Regions:
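A short, well-ordered alpha-helix in the C-terminal region of glycosyltransferases
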Residues: 335, 342, 349-364, 370
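Conserved donor-binding/catalytic core segment of Leloir-type glycosyltransferases
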Residues: 9, 196, 201-217, 221-227, ...
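Nucleotide-activated donor-binding/catalytic signature segment of Leloir-type glycosyltransferases, i.e.
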Residues: 251-269
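Short hydrophobic beta-strand element within catalytic cores of glycosyltransferases
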Residues: 306-309
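Donor nucleotide-sugar binding/catalytic pocket of nucleotide-sugar-dependent glycosyltransferases
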Residues: 134-182, 187
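Conserved acidic donor-binding segment of nucleotide-sugar-dependent glycosyltransferases
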Residues: 321-322, 326-333, 342-348
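Short alpha-helical donor nucleotide-sugar binding micro-motif in glycosyltransferases
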Residues: 82, 137, 268-269, 276-281
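Aromatic "clamp/platform" in nucleotide-sugar-dependent glycosyltransferases that forms part
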Residues: 289
Length: 384
């Protein structure tokens, strides 16, 4: 059966690489797509423009950070928009702001999408957030998330389990792929020529983290662990990408530890250039305290990198300790440092573990396959 053309409003808090991925894929369908942004873009994380064939809507939101006192005004304006556009469904998330505003506005065909942190962390913050979460999910026609941990949380807050679908947001497996064997051969040949430094090169290990420098992502935990590792092993380096509100704190930890010269700050890196950074590394580290299915973890796995990640539920859906990566106790600096040093000792295993990580990504993280699940969910929302 041929799917009918739908009018869809995609309503998100900001405009990130994740939003671009959804909007670009939606723009390639026959559906009519509208993009609604809740907040002004304060820290640019996506340098590509909103895809062609997507109509960005000017409305009461999108001008500043979200404030609770603006909710009535935003809700009234969203009602106006739904009367004008007459969408078949609204795809909205995070739960406690975008999806909540749609639920308050009384729009029935709401697909609420969790962004991970909204249910794992925000939902239980206080009585108000609990009420907002419960209200939104009970008013949602359908719910989607990228991990079982968030689906279970949504059900606990009143979402009908039969109206839920889990699919990892996934990545482009052609864009993120292991270094080819030819480049490995070239690297090996060039290192043999540099005999004076060849022994040092063979010992060097580069750690890599691309998480945003916000408290929920635990980059400060990695910084502290790196100071400990560097005091034991002089051949370990660290690459940090991105930035965020913890920038001063993280730099201070590294400066006080006397390891600044062994850390490379790559800044904000566009999607086109990201694979090159993964290829510079030997181990990918994600010290996040909160995650569903982490897209950066999927990128690293697809790039054939062995990954060392916090033992939170979302990560354990992807990493089997000692098989296709390693786990450390969430927030435990000493355990992370020990696991890094232990991994380095088994450097000869990196290739094998990286190959298993790539295999996992190929089986479960293919965006093109996973996106079809979203389109099926749209049909269910429309027919609800």
């Amino acid at each position: 059966l041929e799917r009918e053309t739908l009018k869809i409003i995609y309503f998100s808090k900001n405009y990130t690489p994740h939003d671009y991925r959804f909007l670009f894929s939606l723009s390639q369908t026959k559906h009519e797509i509208f993009f609604l942004q809740l907040e002004a873009t304060l820290r640019q994380t996506e340098d590509r423009p909103v895809p062609a064939n997507v109509r960005q809507i000017l409305w009461a939101g999108g001008k500043r950070e979200f404030r609770w006192r603006d909710v009535p005004r935003l809700t009234f304006d969203l009602r106006r928009l739904t009367k004008e556009i007459k969408p078949d469904l609204i795809h909205a998330g995070p739960i406690q702001n975008c999806a909540f505003i749609v639920a308050l506005g009384g729009f029935r065909h709401l697909l609420a999408m969790s962004w991970g942190y909204d249910l794992v962390m925000e939902a239980d913050k206080n009585w108000w957030m609990k009420r907002v979460t419960r209200y939104t999910l009970r008013k949602s026609a359908f719910f989607t998330s990228d991990a079982n941990v968030t689906r279970e949380k949504a059900i606990a807050y009143g979402m009908n389990p039969e109206h839920t679908v889990v699919f990892p947001w996934g990545i482009d497996l052609e864009h993120f792929r292991p270094k080819d064997t030819e480049s490995r051969k070239r690297k090996a040949a060039s290192s043999k020529k540099k005999l004076s430094v060849s022994s040092k090169q063979s010992k060097e290990v580069t750690l890599f983290c691309s998480r945003t420098w916000e408290s929920i992502y635990g980059v400060d935990v990695l910084a502290k662990a790196f100071v400990k590792v560097a005091s034991v092993n002089p051949d370990v380096n660290l690459i940090l990408l991105g930035g965020g509100s913890q920038s001063a704190r993280i730099r201070q930890i590294l400066m006080n530890g006397g390891v600044m010269e062994r850390v490379h700050f790559g800044g904000q890196v566009g999607q086109g250039d990201l694979p090159r950074w993964y290829h510079m590394a030997d181990i990918y580290i994600s010290p996040s305290h909160v995650d569903g299915s982490s897209v950066t973890l999927m990128e690293a796995m697809a790039s054939g990198l062995p990954c060392l990640v916090s033992d939170i539920a979302g990560n354990k859906e992807w990493i089997e300790d000692g098989v296709n990566g390693w786990l450390f106790r969430d927030g435990d600096v000493d355990d992370l440092a020990e696991k890094i040093l232990s991994a380095i000792k088994s450097k000869r295993e990196f290739r094998r573990i990286g190959e298993l990580a790539r295999k996992t990504a190929e089986e479960r993280a293919d965006w093109r396959k996973n996106f079809g699940t979203l389109l099926e969910a749209y049909e269910k929302v429309k027919s609800d």
